Regions:
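Cyclic-dinucleotide signaling modules
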Residues: 1-56, 60
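PAS-family sensory domains
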Residues: 1-3, 87, 172
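Small-residue (primarily alanine) positions within well-ordered alpha-helices
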Residues: 8-10, 26-29, 33, 91, ...
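EAL-family c-di-GMP phosphodiesterase catalytic domain
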Residues: 13-15, 81, 85, 96-99, ...
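Regular, well-ordered alpha-helical segments
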Residues: 28-31, 35, 64, 134, ...
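Bacterial c-di-GMP phosphodiesterase EAL domain
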Residues: 46-53, 57-169, 179-182, 195-196, ...
């Protein structure tokens, strides 16, 4: 059993002139500490009560959205640089709010994780992605993100096995993406779950590589089949020699470990040319396609990709 401690602090008289007010503000600070991941203390700041109310509103609307099926899955294509052909897509969830329109995951995923809603939401995304991918060409994979909270709660291997069985998608065509944050705590338990997933035949990818801690030790210990280079390195490598050297080294490391490398956030022809020169196997980014509905016709043709020459930066 893992026991964690979070502390919320409010001071009198600055944070309230009555005991009831100070206690209420301390409770708000405690909720903020837990919402930021726990195992920390947080001092009350004016405005937190409004932020907490907004968060509770999002939580309430999230619960309604799950029942109303207001979510949709969009796909961003991934390409093989050597053949210049699409090899798969990453599944990304969007919330189609009846009032506010399309909402990106950055505005609701953290709330889903803190409230336990990430479990049913994540399973819904996994099932939808596998259902869609079963209709794609047999050579195409689908990548699905797993949050740390989703991974820790319950038996993720059993859930994945059940979804694969229901949808008929071969396990080798499913790739599960996790971030380094998942590997920091409970490493033995995480390793066991990852090994069970690999035994199913599912591929495991480390997402946002280079943004966390002890990345190299993770590569030696955990059963990864792919590394995704974080977009910050790709964005800066054409003008920063240090970033360029890091990208080149990661690609070489992948070859040595027999691990596929995918460069995220490719937006310019210059970046693509440099990655091709370095021998990067796969790319993903706005240069090659924005997240959207899966192009079944384009997949069936599996022709060479024509990069979007006027790709613009926007939130994926």
């Amino acid at each position: 059993m893992l026991v964690t401690t979070s502390v919320g602090i409010a001071l009198a008289p600055g944070d309230g002139d009555t005991a009831a007010t100070v206690l209420r503000h301390a409770g708000i600070a405690l909720a903020r500490a837990k919402g930021d991941g726990g195992q920390r203390m947080c001092f009350f700041e004016h405005g937190m009560d409004k932020a907490l109310q907004r968060r509770r509103t999002v939580e309430h609307e999230l619960r309604l959205a799950l029942g109303r099926e207001e979510f949709e899955v969009v796909y961003q294509p991934q390409y093989d640089l050597a053949t210049e052909r699409q090899c798969g897509s990453e599944a990304l969830v969007r919330w189609q709010h009846p009032v506010h329109g399309k909402i990106a995951p950055g505005h609701f995923i953290s709330v889903a994780e803190d409230t336990g809603l990430i479990g049913p939401l994540g399973e819904w995304v996994l099932r939808r992605a596998c259902t869609d991918a079963a209709k794609w060409p047999e050579s195409f994979i689908v990548a699905v993100n797993l949050s740390p909270a989703q991974f820790r709660d319950g038996d993720i291997a059993e859930t994945v096995a059940q979804v694969l069985n229901e949808t008929g998608l071969p396990p080798e065509r499913l790739e599960l993406e996790i971030t380094e944050n998942l590997l920091i705590n409970d490493t033995e338990e995480v390793l066991g779950k990852l090994n069970r997933l690999r035994q199913l035949g599912v591929a495991i990818a480390m997402d946002d590589f280079g943004t966390g801690y002890s990345s190299l030790s993770y590569l030696a210990r955990f059963p990864f089949s792919k590394i995704k280079i974080d977009r910050q390195f790709i964005r800066n490598m054409t003008r920063d020699p240090a970033m360029r050297a890091i990208v080149k080294t990661i690609i070489a490391l992948g070859k040595s470990l027999d691990v596929t490398i995918t460069a995220e956030g490719v937006e310019t022809q210059e970046q693509a040319a440099m990655l091709r020169e370095f021998g990067c196997p796969q790319v993903q980014g706005f240069l090659y396609g924005y997240p959207g509905a899966a192009d079944l016709e384009g997949m069936a043709q599996s022709g060479k990709v024509t990069p979007i020459s006027s790709a613009r930066s926007s939130a994926a």
